[in-house]
């Protein structure tokens, strides 16, 4: 069975807490054991330190590193490379171009989960118009995400560039 560690954002942050709950539930459903969770404080350097600590605590045991954002994924990758660890899969979140480029270069960051800001903005305006018209507005509005990997990374980057105009 696969074993994972989670490098999360900041203690007490609602978004970070909800993301953590989702990661843990998905791991449980997939039969992945979560060995530990450490904060990277949403920073590359913080995640590098967290990953160094995790590699020390769990030598040769970590298969997957789940990160709450792409900066922490890059920090985790830096720590793994410094320690000579290459048989590990790191997953980020946000779909930053820098992380996608690492994925395309075959680095340890293998995927990132990209939010869809255009769709999110569109749905916010739709909800605002409904509210102004005194129509019912959904309490929760879910926006899609896209998993970006080596297979679709270049198309994702091309789309990002096209959206810049």
Each predicted region: which residue ranges?
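A conserved helix-loop-strand patch within extracytoplasmic ligand-binding domains
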Residues: 1-5
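Ligand-binding cleft/hinge of the Venus flytrap
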Residues: 20-31
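Structural signal for short hydrophobic segments within the conserved structured cores
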Residues: 35-38, 111, 146
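Hinge/cleft segment of the Venus flytrap/periplasmic-binding protein
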Residues: 7-11, 15, 25-27, 116-165
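Hydrophobic alpha-helical
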Residues: 22-23, 35-36, 40-102
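Short beta-strand elements at the ligand-binding edges of bilobed clamshell
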Residues: 105-118
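Conserved donor sugar-nucleotide recognition element shared by glycan-biosynthetic enzymes
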Residues: 15-19, 43, 47, 121
């Amino acid at each position: 069975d696969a074993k994972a560690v989670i490098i999360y954002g900041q203690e007490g942050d609602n978004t970070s807490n909800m993301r953590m709950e989702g990661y843990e539930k998905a791991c449980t459903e997939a039969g992945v054991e979560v060995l530990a969770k450490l904060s990277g404080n949403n920073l590359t350097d913080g995640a590098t330190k967290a990953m160094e600590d995790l590699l020390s605590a769990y030598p040769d045991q970590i298969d997957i590193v789940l990160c709450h954002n792409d900066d922490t994924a890059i920090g985790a990758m830096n720590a793994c490379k410094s320690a000579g660890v290459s048989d590990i899969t790191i997953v980020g979140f946000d779909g930053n171009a820098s992380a996608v480029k690492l994925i395309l270069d075959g680095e340890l960051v293998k995927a990132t989960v990209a939010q869809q800001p255009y769709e999110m903005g569109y749905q916010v305006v739709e909800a605002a118009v409904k509210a102004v018209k005194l129509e019912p507005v959904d309490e929760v509005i879910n926006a899609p995400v896209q998993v970006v990997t080596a297979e679709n990374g270049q198309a994702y980057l091309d789309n990002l560039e096209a959206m810049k105009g």
